[in-house]
Amino acid sequence: MRLHHLLLVLFFLVLSAGSGFTQGIRSRRSCHRNKGVCALTRCPRNMRQIGTCFGPPVKCCRKK
């Protein structure tokens, strides 16, 4: 029974540690705070993607 508790704690630890490595920019507001703009398709050539604005299809882009 103790093994189950240990595995459960380990599972939650892995989940919480993994969430810190995702992209931090996920809204229009945070994109603009990081000096980015939202692009519907892909980022223009002079910009690079730094996150998403409303979900996977809308990208947050910033100058290189």
Curated annotation (Swiss-Prot):
GO molecular function: CCR6 chemokine receptor binding; chemoattractant activity; identical protein binding
Described purpose of this protein according to its UniProt entry: Has bactericidal activity. May act as a ligand for C-C chemokine receptor CCR6. Positively regulates the sperm motility and bactericidal activity in a CCR6-dependent manner. Binds to CCR6 and triggers Ca2+ mobilization in the sperm which is important for its motility.
Cellular-component GO terms for this entry: extracellular space; membrane; microvesicle; sperm midpiece
Main location: secreted
Classification via SUPFAM superfamilies: Defensin-like
PANTHER family, sorted: BETA-DEFENSIN, DEFENSIN BETA 4A
Organism: Capra hircus
Signal peptide (residue range): 1-20
InterPro entries: Beta/alpha-defensin_C (IPR006080), Defensin_beta-like (IPR001855)
Assembly notes: Monomer. Homodimer.
Protein name: Beta-defensin 1
Disulfide bonds: C31-C60, C38-C53, C43-C61
Family: Belongs to the beta-defensin family.
Keyword Repeat part of the UniProt annotation: no
Gene that specifies this protein: DEFB1
Residue ranges listed under propeptide: 21-26
Domain of life: Eukaryota
Gene3D superfamilies named in the record: Antimicrobial Peptide, Beta-defensin 2, Chain A
Keywords, in A-Z order: Antibiotic, Antimicrobial, Defensin, Disulfide bond, Membrane, Secreted, Signal
GO biological process: calcium-mediated signaling; cell chemotaxis; defense response to Gram-negative bacterium; defense response to Gram-positive bacterium; positive regulation of flagellated sperm motility involved in capacitation
Localization terms from the record: Secreted; Membrane
